[in-house]
């Protein structure tokens, strides 16, 4: 939540309607 608040521009909307931080996605992929 902190990341989304600090970097709203890094938030992406997924096809299922959820919003996830690009940073979080990168961490999950890595």
Curated annotation (Swiss-Prot):
It catalyses: ATP + H2O + 4 H(+)(in) = ADP + phosphate + 5 H(+)(out). It comes from the Eukaryota. The keyword ATP-binding applies. Its EC number is 7.1.2.2. The keyword Nucleotide-binding applies. GO terms for molecular function: ATP binding. GO terms for biological process: proton transmembrane transport. It is an enzyme of class 7 (translocase). Keywords: ATP-binding, Hydrogen ion transport, Ion transport, Nucleotide-binding, Translocase, Transport. Transmembrane segments: none annotated. Belongs to the ATPase alpha/beta chains family. Catalytic subunit of the peripheral V1 complex of vacuolar ATPase. V-ATPase vacuolar ATPase is responsible for acidifying a variety of intracellular compartments in eukaryotic cells. V-ATPase is a heteromultimeric enzyme composed of a peripheral catalytic V1 complex (main components: subunits A, B, C, D, E, and F) attached to an integral membrane V0 proton pore complex (main component: the proteolipid protein). Two separate genes encode the catalytic 70 kDa V-ATPase subunit in psilotum and equisetum. This is V-type proton ATPase catalytic subunit A isoform 1. It comes from Psilotum nudum.
